[in-house]
Amino acid sequence: MELKVLNISLNSLNTVEVDDTIFARDFNQALVHQVTTAYMSGSRQGSKAQKNRSAVSGGGKRPWAQKGTGRARAGTTRGPIWRSGGVTFATQPRSYAQKVNKKMYKGAISIIFSELVRSERLKVVKEFDIKEVKTKNMIALLKVLNVKDALLMTDELDENLYLSSRNLYHVGVCDTQSIDPVSLIGYDNVVVTELALKKIEVML
């Protein structure tokens, strides 16, 4: 398969040959969903904690005698039915991580890229020419590329590109080492440099 390589003026410079087994795979919704869900689950902090009856301070002594008072027996004032008592099924810190094989993860990334190519939402450019850190330069670049909501991908993190775009909520910047399924499906368009595309092909 061949993809057009554009310059910043959207003129086609040349084409780049890409592997069909990576950029022309059939869509597998179940795999993409599983990998995306696993990635999001792994991002959860999982530090929520509540106190059960044994973790609440106090309540060591019986509030009244077992027999003779006429009241219902009670062994502690920290049971779940008491005011200031513990939580019945208290949540504890836990990991929400799900295991995903490398082959499955790479397969899902490849399928997402294939779908981007099919829907013409993947643009390949020679390079991003951002000489200085200015948001207006980034807005001008997006206007030329005819995209509003986009993930810009480079082979190595471009500091000028990142700093120029960080004030735009609908624009993301990453390098090939930081690719994740949530970012790829979270933007309307993905704009990738030619060098980054070749790196991705080697990685997948």
Swiss-Prot record:
Record-linked SUPFAM superfamilies: Ribosomal protein L4
Organism: Vesicomyosocius okutanii subsp. Calyptogena okutanii (strain HA)
Protein name: Large ribosomal subunit protein uL4
Annotated GO biological process: translation
One GO location term (cellular component): ribonucleoprotein complex
Subunit structure and binding partners: Part of the 50S ribosomal subunit.
Keyword Ribosomal protein recorded: yes
Record field: compositional bias (Polar residues): 42-55
HAMAP family: Ribosomal_uL4_B
Keywords: Ribonucleoprotein, Ribosomal protein, RNA-binding, rRNA-binding
UniProt xrefs under NCBIfam families: rplD_bact
Entry's Gene Ontology molecular function annotations: rRNA binding; structural constituent of ribosome
Annotated stretches, region: Disordered: 42-85
Record-linked PANTHER family: 50S RIBOSOMAL PROTEIN L4, LARGE RIBOSOMAL SUBUNIT PROTEIN UL4M
Pfam family, any one: Ribosomal_L4
